[in-house]
């Protein structure tokens, strides 16, 4: 599809700019992909594209911190690839995604990184970056982590505590990985579920004849997420390095994060659109396809309170930035687990509907202000991953990634109208009020009037420098705590014989 405007230059008039600290009426001029001027009554130069944003909000382009496009996983490949996935992203107002390189155990991280980057560079329709998963530990991994940080623009590494016998690492390996993250100034991310207990829970369910999707949640209740979340935070804090819990899916896990934050631990939590927009009761649906569509890990929780409580945490700033974990599989792929839920490829959609789901469940419920919405869907992610204010803010010099948002327009989410490749939408039938009517990437319109106008492969890889704001003050915290570790000077122990012989 040809982009309607290749110049990266556009004038947006009469909108209300919303950043995470304030909002104000203004025109915005983007030139060659960079925001050039923000002021009232900017006169358009000859030939410049002008868009009227009267009664609309201008938001910083959304940032999705967690996607898995075309991920080889559980014997298949997720169907939203970097082209379709980023089309769906911009159709919902997201203009920057961070995907995951996931090396197989024993595979070179650099080799896997190069493969993922090749896949992405050929297809992305918006800017992107890459986290790297650490699925094994060795001197080689340690060396390659340094190269990824110093030469490839990676500042985040993910450990899986789940997926025993595939991605899962031990506590001891995680300890060494976290130490390495600290040395390199990279944030340690964790998929926090007790993988050994999940493995036992899965066996138990199958032995009991519970083979359907409901067995997925029953085998890995939220206690296993909360326990692993606590363990990951304790290990990270023992190293005194910032830790980021991905896809926080339960009240239990959120409570653990809150407890440690109150004690001054540098921990961040990422809720996802699924956990903020639906609940896990769908896994008990009598239609197998419907139930299997909601299978992901950690499970979307059946407790109906969860989505509201997670939104409350997000509003208070006790959870930080919203991802999606977009990892989609069609019916025939999910059916690989039709007789055994442990074989259902884990993953759901989210990248297109994320911002409207957060607006509907956050702003329209009175829990989030406009500014808090921007924080949750864009700027906090940019800060944590050290690309603020290039991304996550509408200001002079920032990237021209802008969403024209209509807070009063509604739509009903459906697989029949979404832009994903997947044949199911976990938000099916949900009416949302608050949608992206125009999405601008690097000063070019890529979504408008309900139509995409992307240029495949036009997105850029954005390197993320180490030692971002998440590391501020970490050394001092470490120093103060280490000063408390003192040895006691005492006389050497003497048993009675030694005592008598010295008299
Ligand atoms: O665990 C993840 O984040 C990846 C493998 C996607 N699948 C999922 O169920 N979350
Ligand atoms: Zn995960
Ligand atoms: Zn994931």
Swiss-Prot record:
Its cofactor is Zn(2+). Its EC number is 3.5.2.2. It is an enzyme of class 3 (hydrolase). InterPro entries: Amidohydro-rel, Hydantoinase/dihydroPyrase, Metal-dep_hydrolase_composite, Metal_Hydrolase, Metallo-dep_Hydrolases_sf. Zn(2+) 1 binds at residues 66, 68, 158, 325. One of its GO terms (biological process) is pyrimidine nucleobase catabolic process. It catalyses: 5,6-dihydrouracil + H2O = 3-(carbamoylamino)propanoate + H(+). Catalyzes the second step of the reductive pyrimidine degradation, the reversible hydrolytic ring opening of dihydropyrimidines. Can catalyze the ring opening of 5,6-dihydrouracil to N-carbamyl-alanine and of 5,6-dihydrothymine to N-carbamyl-amino isobutyrate. NCBIfam families: D-hydantoinase. Homotetramer. PANTHER family: COLLAPSIN RESPONSE MEDIATOR PROTEIN, HYDRANTOINASE/DIHYDROPYRIMIDINASE FAMILY MEMBER. This is Dihydropyrimidinase.
């Amino acid at each position: 599809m040809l982009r309607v405007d290749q110049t990266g230059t556009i004038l947006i008039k009469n909108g209300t700019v919303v950043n995470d600290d304030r909002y104000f009426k203004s025109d915005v001029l983007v030139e060659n992909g960079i925001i050039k001027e923000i002021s009232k009554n900017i006169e358009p130069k000859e030939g410049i594209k002008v868009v009227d944003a009267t009664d609309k909000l201008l938001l910083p382009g959304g940032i999705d911190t967690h996607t898995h496009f075309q991920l080889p996983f559980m014997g298949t490949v997720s169907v939203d690839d970097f082209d379709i996935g980023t089309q769906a992203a911009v159709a919902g107002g997201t203009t920057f995604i961070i995907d995951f390189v996931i090396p197989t155990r024993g595979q070179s991280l650099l080799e896997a990184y190069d493969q993922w980057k090749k896949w992405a560079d050929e297809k992305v329709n918006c800017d992107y970056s890459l986290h790297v998963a650490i699925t094994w530990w060795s001197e080689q991994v340690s060396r390659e982590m340094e190269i990824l940080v110093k030469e490839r623009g990676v500042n985040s590494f993910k450990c899986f505590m789940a997926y025993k016998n595939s991605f899962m690492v031990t506590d001891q390996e995680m300890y060494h990985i976290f130490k390495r993250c600290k040395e390199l100034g990279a944030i340690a991310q964790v998929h926090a579920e007790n993988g050994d207990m999940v493995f036992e829970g899965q066996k138990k369910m199958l032995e009991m004849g519970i083979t359907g999707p409901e067995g997925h949640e029953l085998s890995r209740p939220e206690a296993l997420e909360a326990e692993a979340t606590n363990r990951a935070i304790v290990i990270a804090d023992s190293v005194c390095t910032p830790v980021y819990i991905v896809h926080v899916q339960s009240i239990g896990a959120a409570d653990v994060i809150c407890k440690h934050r109150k004690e001054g631990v540098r921990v961040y939590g990422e809720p996802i659109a699924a956990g903020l927009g639906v609940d896990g009761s769908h896994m008990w649906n009598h239609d197998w396809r419907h139930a299997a569509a909601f299978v992901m890990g950690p499970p979307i929780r059946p407790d109906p309170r969860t989505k509201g409580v997670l939104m409350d945490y997000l509003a208070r700033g006790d959870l930080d930035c919203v991802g999606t974990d977009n990892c989609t599989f069609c019916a025939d792929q999910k059916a690989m687990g039709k007789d055994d839920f442990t074989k259902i490829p884990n993953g759901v959609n989210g990248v297109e509907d994320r911002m409207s789901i957060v607006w509907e469940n956050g702003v329209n419920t009175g829990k989030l202000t406009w500014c808090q919405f921007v924080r949750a869907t864009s700027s906090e992610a940019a800060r944590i991953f050290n690309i603020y204010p290039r991304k996550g803010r509408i200001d002079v010099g920032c990237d021209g990634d802008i969403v024209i948002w209509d807070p009063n327009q509604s739509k009903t989410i459906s697989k029949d109208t979404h832009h994903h490749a997947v044949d199911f939408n976990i938000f099916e039938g949900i009416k949302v009020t608050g949608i992206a009517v125009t999405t601008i990437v690097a000063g070019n319109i890529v979504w408008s009037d309900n139509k995409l106008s992307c240029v495949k492969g036009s997105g850029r890889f954005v390197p993320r420098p180490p030692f971002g704001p998440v590391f501020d003050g970490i050394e001092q915290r470490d120093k103060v705590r280490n000063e408390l570790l003192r040895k006691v000077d005492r006389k050497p122990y003497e048993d009675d014989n030694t005592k008598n012989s010295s008299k």
